[in-house]
Structures are given as structure tokens and as C-alpha cells.
Amino acid sequence: MISLSYSLSLAAILFMLGLTGIMIRRNLLFLLLGLEIMINAAALAFVIVGQYWGQADGQVMYILTVTIAATEASIGLALLLHLYRYYQTLDIDLISEMHR
């Protein structure tokens, strides 16, 4: 069995990878992908801790988190499509300049 510290380290690395993607990228699609990675890392941490404590609470939180992530992804992609049709770009800086 893999220890708790290794498993939570993996979840933390995934979370940091998503956060790095959000901080570095200027494209809205990549920001949405980074956010999804962060949400999935948090869900993984819920499952790991629930398994460690021997309770099903982690799996319940995982189902809730995945449901919220799916909702966020569908709404986010719909907004991205609308922005792309209107501005013909997904670059945050260009959209901000065009808005003024």
C-alpha cells in the first residue's frame, strides 16, 4: 500500500501543476484546463484521505467534486465559445484591450 504522504504529495504536485498553468498561460482554454486539473487534484486528496481514515466520506466528496467540475466545464466551455465567436480570440490580454 502506498503511504499517505506519497499520495498527498502526488495530489499537491497535480494541484501545483494546475496552478502553474493558470498563472503562466494567457489563453482562456488553458486557464479552464488548469482549473480542472486543480479540482481533480483536490478530489484525489479527498479520496486518499477517506481511504486512509477508512471512511466513505472521501468518495462522497469525490462524486460531489466531479459533479461540480463537470458543471463548471460545461458552463465555461459555453462561455468560451461565445467569447471566441464575438472576439475571434481567447487571449485574455487581447480581449481586455478590445473591451475598452
From Swiss-Prot:
Its EC number is 7.1.1.-. Its main location: membrane. The chain crosses the membrane at residues 4-24, 29-49, 60-80. It is a multi-pass membrane protein. One of its GO terms (molecular function) is quinone binding. InterPro entries: NADH_UbQ_OxRdtase_chain4L/K (IPR001133), NUOK/Mnh_C1-like (IPR039428). It is found in: Cell membrane. One of its GO terms (biological process) is ATP synthesis coupled electron transport. It is an enzyme of class 7 (translocase). Keywords: Cell membrane, Membrane, NAD, Quinone, Translocase, Transmembrane, Transmembrane helix, Transport, Ubiquinone. Belongs to the complex I subunit 4L family. HAMAP family: NDH1_NuoK (MF_01456). NDH-1 shuttles electrons from NADH, via FMN and iron-sulfur (Fe-S) centers, to quinones in the respiratory chain. The immediate electron acceptor for the enzyme in this species is believed to be ubiquinone. Couples the redox reaction to proton translocation (for every two electrons transferred, four hydrogen ions are translocated across the cytoplasmic membrane), and thus conserves the redox energy in a proton gradient. NDH-1 is composed of 14 different subunits. Subunits NuoA, H, J, K, L, M, N constitute the membrane sector of the complex. This is NADH-quinone oxidoreductase subunit K. It comes from Baumannia cicadellinicola subsp. Homalodisca coagulata. The gene is nuoK.
